[in-house]
Each structure stands twice: as C-alpha cells, then as structure tokens.
Amino acid sequence: MKFYLVGGAVRDMLLGITPKDKDWVVVGATEDEMLANGFIKIAANFPVFIHPQTKQEYALARSEKKTRNGYHGFEVNFSKYITL
C-alpha cells in the first residue's frame, strides 16, 4: 500500500502556498484493506475514505474507460494492481 499526495495541495506547494487540505490516492490496496486499517468509507458507490486521525481524504487508484455517450458513460476499475 502506497500513498501519493494529489490535487490542489500539490499545486499549492509548487506555488509556495501552505495547503489548506490534503487529498491522497492509494495504490496497492483494496477497499477491505482500507477498512481493516481504520479508514472510514465516505462514499457509497466510490472507494473514498477519511483517515480517522487526520481527517484527510484517501481514494483508491482507478482507471476509467469511456463506454457510452454522456456524463455517466464510463466503466471504472478500482483494482489494487492499478499504478500511477
């Protein structure tokens, strides 16, 4: 299980600004492993978790494939074998 800082926190740090919040992507983990490590799932249909102490957001790495027209026409894969 590896954790990578992503999103606005990375941008802010590159600009020399202290990030207000930090979001993380998790590689090499399953939903069950996250729960077993004390993370709290916050999304019903998406593996996004909150760290119990820091309250920072952690999302499992994913791949997406366009399958249909429109905003919802995607197939999403959350395998622990997805890399960045």
Curated annotation (Swiss-Prot):
<feature type="binding site">
    <location>
        <position position="8"/>
    </location>
    <ligand>
        <name>ATP</name>
    </ligand>
</feature>
<dbReference type="InterPro" id="IPR050124">
    <property type="entry name" value="tRNA_CCA-adding_enzyme"/>
</dbReference>
<comment type="function">
    <text>Catalyzes the addition and repair of the essential 3'-terminal CCA sequence in tRNAs without using a nucleic acid template. Adds these three nucleotides in the order of C, C, and A to the tRNA nucleotide-73, using CTP and ATP as substrates and producing inorganic pyrophosphate. tRNA 3'-terminal CCA addition is required both for tRNA processing and repair. Also involved in tRNA surveillance by mediating tandem CCA addition to generate a CCACCA at the 3' terminus of unstable tRNAs. While stable tRNAs receive only 3'-terminal CCA, unstable tRNAs are marked with CCACCA and rapidly degraded.</text>
</comment>
<dbReference type="GO" id="GO:0005524">
    <property type="term" value="F:ATP binding"/>
</dbReference>
<keyword id="KW-0548">Nucleotidyltransferase</keyword>
<keyword id="KW-0067">ATP-binding</keyword>
<dbReference type="GO" id="GO:0008033">
    <property type="term" value="P:tRNA processing"/>
</dbReference>
<keyword id="KW-0808">Transferase</keyword>
<feature type="binding site">
    <location>
        <position position="11"/>
    </location>
    <ligand>
        <name>ATP</name>
    </ligand>
</feature>
<feature type="binding site">
    <location>
        <position position="21"/>
    </location>
    <ligand>
        <name>Mg(2+)</name>
    </ligand>
</feature>
<keyword id="KW-0460">Magnesium</keyword>
<feature type="binding site">
    <location>
        <position position="23"/>
    </location>
    <ligand>
        <name>Mg(2+)</name>
    </ligand>
</feature>
<keyword id="KW-0547">Nucleotide-binding</keyword>
<feature type="binding site">
    <location>
        <position position="11"/>
    </location>
    <ligand>
        <name>CTP</name>
    </ligand>
</feature>
<keyword id="KW-0479">Metal-binding</keyword>
<dbReference type="Pfam" id="PF01743">
    <property type="entry name" value="PolyA_pol"/>
</dbReference>
<keyword id="KW-0694">RNA-binding</keyword>
<feature type="binding site">
    <location>
        <position position="8"/>
    </location>
    <ligand>
        <name>CTP</name>
    </ligand>
</feature>
<dbReference type="InterPro" id="IPR002646">
    <property type="entry name" value="PolA_pol_head_dom"/>
</dbReference>
<keyword id="KW-0819">tRNA processing</keyword>
<dbReference type="GO" id="GO:0004810">
    <property type="term" value="F:CCA tRNA nucleotidyltransferase activity"/>
</dbReference>
<dbReference type="InterPro" id="IPR043519">
    <property type="entry name" value="NT_sf"/>
</dbReference>
<protein>
    <recommendedName>
        <fullName>CCA tRNA nucleotidyltransferase</fullName>
        <ecNumber>2.7.7.72</ecNumber>
    </recommendedName>
</protein>
<dbReference type="GO" id="GO:0046872">
    <property type="term" value="F:metal ion binding"/>
</dbReference>
<dbReference type="GO" id="GO:0003723">
    <property type="term" value="F:RNA binding"/>
</dbReference>
<comment type="similarity">
    <text>Belongs to the tRNA nucleotidyltransferase/poly(A) polymerase family.</text>
</comment>
